[in-house]
């Protein structure tokens, strides 16, 4: 059914975000920062409604003094509603990702470093994009001129906690649509009482009479393919709703129509290939895009991705231009117009209407891109790409057997997730081993010389090492692994992985160098040194200490204390005038 959508978004007057007193609120906020805890989870909450004269309209933004640019407001308005052709009646949940525009966002800016240093790379805060989690309701309503009630509640965050925020919306949105503004204000105040998301901690998050219990993943977690065990309930009343994950989707449900091509899709993601996912609705498109981008874990997905994208997006021209090669982006769309617009893209995945029966849906077929010409294109993976690795038939048999035996979908998802995790690890482990061999030996790190350089990554040397230490040691899949690595070297994911590993190794080298200095006899070193050399040492030690205290260097607390003691000792040996310069009152 087609429900018309108006010409475009506008800022609607009124609403909670517009009527709240800004002067007193800002003064209090500056003094007490009452939204600091809220902003550790969310940037803001938006309500988008359909106005007969204005089209999609931003009814309110809360907290009211959170600043969105006009371009961001317009993007949120369009992305918060399904395309008119999809005709989503009832309640629909989906997500989107949009680029931030510059400028200060709020009075209570969050420092990302503490969280990002401990979080898995794939779950770090987005530095330049907003993630929008949408609950859209469209129902018949005779009291409205058009005959339909159409409204979206949107949680805007920089955290990729799709499972948590979808669960949160399923509690908040139905209540909000009944009670409107006062309910939303109460919810935001409750979130402002939550503890910050600290990686490795299990948190109890009270909301609307319910307690949601979640564990925030940590970088040091052992990668598991099964859900974590339920934590102690701590005699909480009411008993908490335990989320087994803040971010993991039901992979089996997402990949059901494309299970026979999971291997090929994994390779396309690994290589950062441009891919369009054309789905019948934004919930299907956004979940499949997020599932695709998650299948490389523990690798961080380094390309752009848009779980739901529309022709009204401010970046539409930039991402669909034919004057240059398609960008490294995964686009989730629902408008068939994109088939014509993106004919030049090398890979298009067309998904049909989801089947809710227990049987496995008809699998999409591999088709040549040349057949992608009409708006009524049939479901299929349109690509000329040939997979480097052979298909894992044993996995497909196990999943098919699970369907026949009506195995729970969460168990099916765990099987699929473990397969993808082991596949990615088998690919990455040889790279990790080779990279580790480029690290200088600890015996070559001396206190009074600059630390040695990390050896350069030589692709030919690495490829030669695969004969004895390749993925065949941990993976039964056969195929052209060498060819896959060669293509991987040209991808954004190799660049992202290498930069991250090189940065970590450089920090480790610097930390080892600091430890070597702290274990040396500094009095003996100072005996024949000029004042200039001693002052230079103080300045360098201070710089290292600041970096270490800011968690940019992996050093122990005892090393930090010893470094500070060394600085004090060295300064104490200098003339009073220099001491006054180095330690001003």
UniProtKB/Swiss-Prot annotation:
Taxonomy, superkingdom: Eukaryota
Signal peptide: none
Xref: PROSITE patterns: DENN
GO cellular component: recycling endosome
Classification via Pfam families: DENN
Annotated compartments: Recycling endosome; Cytoplasm
A molecular function GO annotation: guanyl-nucleotide exchange factor activity
Region (Disordered) residue spans: 1-25
Residues annotated as domain uDENN: 43-221
Keywords for the protein's UniProt record, in alphabetical order: Cytoplasm, Endosome, Guanine-nucleotide releasing factor
Segments of skewed composition (Low complexity): 1-10
Residue ranges occupied by any cDENN domain in the UniProt entry: 246-373
Domain spans labelled dDENN: 375-499
Function comment: Guanine nucleotide exchange factor (GEF) for RAB14. Also has some, lesser GEF activity towards RAB35.
Family as reported in the entry's similarity comment: Belongs to the DENND6 family.
Designated name of the protein: Protein DENND6B
Organism: Mus musculus
Source species taxonomy: Eukaryota, Metazoa, Chordata, Craniata, Vertebrata
């Amino acid at each position: 059914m087609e429900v018309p959508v108006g010409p475009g978004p506008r800022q609607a007057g009124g609403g909670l975000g517009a009527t709240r007193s800004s002067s007193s609120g800002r003064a209090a906020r500056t003094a007490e920062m009452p939204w600091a805890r809220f902003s550790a989870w969310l940037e803001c909450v938006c309500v988008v409604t359909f106005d007969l004269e204005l089209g999609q309209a931003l009814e309110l933004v809360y907290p009211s003094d959170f600043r969105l640019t006009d371009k961001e407001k317009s993007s949120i308005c369009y992305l918060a509603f399904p395309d008119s052709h999809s005709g989503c009646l009832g309640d629909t949940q989906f997500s989107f990702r949009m680029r931030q525009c510059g400028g200060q966002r709020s009075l209570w800016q969050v420092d990302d470093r503490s969280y990002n240093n401990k979080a898995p790379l794939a779950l770090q805060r987005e530095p330049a994009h907003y993630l929008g989690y949408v609950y859209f309701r469209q129902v018949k309503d005779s009291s409205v001129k058009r005959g339909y009630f159409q409204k979206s509640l949107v949680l805007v965050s920089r955290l990729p906690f799709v499972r948590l925020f979808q669960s949160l919306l399923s509690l908040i949105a139905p209540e909000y649509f009944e009670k409107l503004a006062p309910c939303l204000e109460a919810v935001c105040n409750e979130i402002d009482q939550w503890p910050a998301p600290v990686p490795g901690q299990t948190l109890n998050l009270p909301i609307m009479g319910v307690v949601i219990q979640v564990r925030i993943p940590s970088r040091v977690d052992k990668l598991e393919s099964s859900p974590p065990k339920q934590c102690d309930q701590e005699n909480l009343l009411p008993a908490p709703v335990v989320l087994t994950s803040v971010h993991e989707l039901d992979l089996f449900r997402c990949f059901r129509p494309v299970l026979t091509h999971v291997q090929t899709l994994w390779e396309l993601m690994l290589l950062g290939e441009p891919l369009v996912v054309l789905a019948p609705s934004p919930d299907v498109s956004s979940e499949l895009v997020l599932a695709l981008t998650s299948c490389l874990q523990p690798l961080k997905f380094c390309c752009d991705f848009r779980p739901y994208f529309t022709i009204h997006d401010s970046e539409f021209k930039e991402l669909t231009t034919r004057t240059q090669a398609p960008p490294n982006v995964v686009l989730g769309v629902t408008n068939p117009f994109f088939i014509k617009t993106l004919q030049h893209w090398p890979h298009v995945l067309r998904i049909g209407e989801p089947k809710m029966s227990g049987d496995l849906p008809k699998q999409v077929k591999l088709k040549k891109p040349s057949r992608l010409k009409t708006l009524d294109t049939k479901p299929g993976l349109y690509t000329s790409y040939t997979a480097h690795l052979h298909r894992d038939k044993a996995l497909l048999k196990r999943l098919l057997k699970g369907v026949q035996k009506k195995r729970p979908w969460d168990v099916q998802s765990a099987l699929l997730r473990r397969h993808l995790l082991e596949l990615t690890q088998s690919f990455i482990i040889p790279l990790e081993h080779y990279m580790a061999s480029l690290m200088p030996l600890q015996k070559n790190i001396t206190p009074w010389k600059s630390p040695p350089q990390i050896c350069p990554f030589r692709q030919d040397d690495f490829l030669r090492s695969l004969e004895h230490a390749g993925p065949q040691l941990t993976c039964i899949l056969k195929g052209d692994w060498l060819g896959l690595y060669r293509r991987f070297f040209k991808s954004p994911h190799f660049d992202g992985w290498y930069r991250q590993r090189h940065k970590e190794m450089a920090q480790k080298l610097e930390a080892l160098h600091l430890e070597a200095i702290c274990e040396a006899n500094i009095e003996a070193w100072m005996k024949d040194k000029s004042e200039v050399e001693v002052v230079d040492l103080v300045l360098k030690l201070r710089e290292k200490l600041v970096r270490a205290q800011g968690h940019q260097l992996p050093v122990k607390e005892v090393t930090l204390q010893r470094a500070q003691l060394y600085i004090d000792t060295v300064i104490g040996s200098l003339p009073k005038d220099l001491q006054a310069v180095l330690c001003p009152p």
